[in-house]
Swiss-Prot record:
The gene is CAPN1. CDD domains: Calpain_III, EFh_PEF_CAPN1. It comes from Oryctolagus cuniculus (Rabbit). GO terms for molecular function: calcium ion binding; calcium-dependent cysteine-type endopeptidase activity; peptidase activity. It catalyses: Broad endopeptidase specificity. It holds the Pfam family EF-hand_8. Activated by micromolar concentrations of calcium and inhibited by calpastatin. This is Calpain-1 catalytic subunit. GO terms for biological process: proteolysis; regulation of catalytic activity; self proteolysis. It is an enzyme of class 3 (hydrolase). GO terms for cellular component: cytosol; plasma membrane. Ca(2+) 2 binds at D216, D218, S220, S222, E227. Residues 1-114 are annotated as: Domain III.
Length: 302
């Protein structure tokens, strides 16, 4: 009698008939099975990094990578915890799939996902007196006589800046996206950005530009879903799969790429909301309670 546990893995591509109407053929797919290290067994939110896969060989894999709708293989492995990694043969290909698992004996399965968290450095908030004189001069030039940046002025400033960076794909910052940024950064509630508020936003955008360029791996001037995930993690955020899907749905263009203006709006909102939540979570239990007025004030204003 064979020793070990017998099971069948099947990986199926979804929506291929719909994709074929747009000229997209079947992707070349397959999967690999890795044993979970003893010290990580039982962890509910296991996340294996790139170094793990470089240092550990797979215990089993599909017989081949092939451009069929479904790939399936029967395996027999010793009892233990394993991670199944489905993939396309070529890296960074987008696609929906179903992974099915059939076993002779009862076995538990779960989808691995990240816990939501943000590792953000303390934001340096300078007083007006501490801000660099060159920046003050720039601010006075941009803000005009009232020394406040309005929504329209912010739109003009950002679009003037991005137009000088020919490597960035953008349709320009819309009035709505600029209004959202002003509302998120406006601490005194007057609907405009003063010197200190604009200084914070300016520093954030400079940081986001560096992250965008670093993770625009194909130099397309935009972010694919794969690049977007790495960029968001580099900015200090850990999100789960559902939130990543919502971000791509909310901020991507019809080709599922995220332009620079949408990338900035996304990260400004993420960082502001995480910092806002942290301020309200005084007992650090990860739960904040709002009354209806506070909830409407927060959601409608942002």
């Amino acid at each position: 009698r064979e020793s070990g546990c017998s099971f069948v893995l099947a990986l199926m591509q979804k929506h291929r008939r719909r994709e074929r109407r747009f000229g997209r053929d079947m992707e070349t797919i397959g999967f690999a099975v890795y044993e979970v290290p003893r010290e990580l067994v039982g962890q509910p939110a296991l996340h294996l990094k790139r170094d793990f896969f470089l240092a550990n060989a797979s215990r089993a894999r599909s017989e081949q990578f092939i451009n069929l709708r479904e790939v399936s293989t029967r395996f027999r492995l010793p009892p233990g915890e394993y991670v199944v990694v489905p993939s396309t043969f070529e890296p960074n290909k987008e696609g929906d799939f179903v992974l099915r698992f059939f076993s002779e004996k009862r076995a538990g399965t779960q989808e691995l996902d990240d816990q939501i968290q943000a590792n953000l450095p303390d934001e340096q908030v300078l007083s007006a007196e501490e801000i660099d004189e060159n920046f003050k001069a720039l601010f006075r030039q941009l803000a005009g006589e009232d020394l406040e940046i309005s929504v329209r002025e912010l739109q003009t400033i950002l679009n003037r800046i991005t137009s000088k960076h020919k490597d960035l794909r953008t349709k320009g910052f819309s009035m709505e996206s600029c209004r959202s940024m002003v509302n998120l950064m406006d601490r005194d509630g007057n609907g405009k950005l003063g010197l200190v508020e604009f200084n914070i936003l300016w520093n954030r955008i400079r940081n986001y530009l560096a992250i965008f360029r670093k993770f625009d791996l194909d130099k397309s001037g935009s972010m694919s879903a794969y690049e977007m995930r790495m960029a968001i993690e580099s900015a200090g955020f850990k999100l789960n799969k559902k939130l990543y899907e919502l971000i791509i749905t909310r901020y991507s263009e019809p080709d599922l790429a995220v332009d620079f203006d949408n990338f900035v709006c996304c990260l400004v909102r993420l960082e502001t909301m995480f910092r806002f939540f942290k301020t309200l979570d005084t007992d650090l239990d990860g739960v904040v309670t709002f009354d209806l007025f506070k909830w409407l004030q927060l959601t409608m204003f942002a």
